[in-house]
């Protein structure tokens, strides 16, 4: 619960346990055995961030977070907790502004990225390529860039790999050695990603990650819920999404630490995210 600029987390030894918003950019871990309230704790934090006007992103692996968009219902256990934590005079059941996302486009808005946006480095990590294979993938991306070709989806990447392999003798003097064996290995490595639904993730229109940094009309932060019930069962595609998301955040979010050591850096807008994967 958000009160007086802090998130009221609970009680310990009769004293309130609170989380100050200016400390929320630290990494955190919610741990505990089954049934001890990990998901409830995460939901309380998400709701509190929203009340503070901070957009939230979280992954719903079990499918039990979606109800955050509708008001809860009273129960005997809930009434006891309201009294225990001294919230009787100010607690109200309410829904929160929520946007649902789904890589598989079944339980929410589509989440897409282009192959060009992903880049050869991230793709190589996702596909588990060797150093030689990664080098060839860099060559393929460079040739596409030199020719002004955008790699939108996995079909584009396959077509480009096939094209480079067929014309490798023309490019070897400019870009370096290209072997058909390595190209074939990259094509094989694409199969698991395609089978897990990669054709749904890679494509257009690509998601602008700034769409997750919105507030509702009443000033509360938007809670963005990614449906991961199916996605978590497909680790290659899940890793693709997470690596892409982190790289996008690293690219567009300002670095607060720069201001401390460089007074010429302009004052950036600060956005806090709560992410449980």
Question: What is the predicted role of each segment?
Answer:
Residues 1-17:
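N-terminal pre-Walker A segment at the start of P-loop NTPase domains
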Residues 5, 15, 26, 96, ...:
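Residue-level signal for beta-strand positions within conserved beta-sheet cores that form or flank
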Residues 15, 23-28, 220-224:
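Pre-Walker A (Motif I) flank of P-loop NTPase domains
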Residues 30-34:
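The conserved Walker
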Residues 38:
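Conserved lysine of the Walker
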Residues 41-42:
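Post-Walker A alpha-helix
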Residues 46-56, 63-277:
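P-loop NTPase motor domains
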């Amino acid at each position: 619960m958000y009160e007086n600029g802090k998130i009221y987390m609970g009680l310990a030894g009769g004293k309130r346990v609170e989380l100050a918003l200016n400390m929320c950019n630290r990494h955190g871990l919610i741990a505990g055995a089954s049934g001890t309230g990990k998901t409830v704790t995460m939901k309380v934090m998400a709701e509190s961030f929203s009340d503070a006007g901070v957009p939230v992103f979280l992954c719903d692996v079990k499918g039990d977070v979606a109800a955050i968009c509708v008001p809860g219902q009273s129960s005997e256990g809930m009434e006891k907790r309201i009294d225990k934590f001294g919230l009787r005079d100010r607690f109200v059941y309410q829904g929160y502004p929520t946007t649902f996302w789904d890589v598989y486009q079944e339980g929410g808005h589509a989440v897409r990225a282009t192959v060009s946006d992903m880049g050869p480095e991230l793709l190589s990590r996702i596909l588990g390529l060797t150093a030689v294979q990664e080098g060839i993938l860099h060559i393929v991306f460079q040739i596409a860039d030199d020719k002004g070709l955008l790699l939108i989806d996995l079909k584009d990447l396959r077509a480009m790999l096939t094209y480079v392999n067929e014309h490798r003798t023309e490019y070897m003097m400019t870009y370096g050695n290209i072997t058909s064996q390595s190209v074939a290995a990259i094509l094989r490595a694409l199969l698991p990603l395609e089978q897990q639904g990669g054709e749904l993730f890679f494509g257009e229109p690509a998601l602008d990650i700034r769409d997750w940094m919105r507030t509702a009309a009443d000033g509360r932060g938007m809670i963005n819920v990614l449906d991961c019930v199916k996605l978590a069962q497909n680790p290659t595609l899940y890793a693709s999404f997470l690596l892409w998301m982190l790289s996008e955040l690293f690219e567009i979010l300002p670095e607060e630490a720069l201001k401390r050591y460089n007074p010429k850096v302009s004052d950036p807008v600060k956005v806090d995210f709560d992410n449980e994967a």
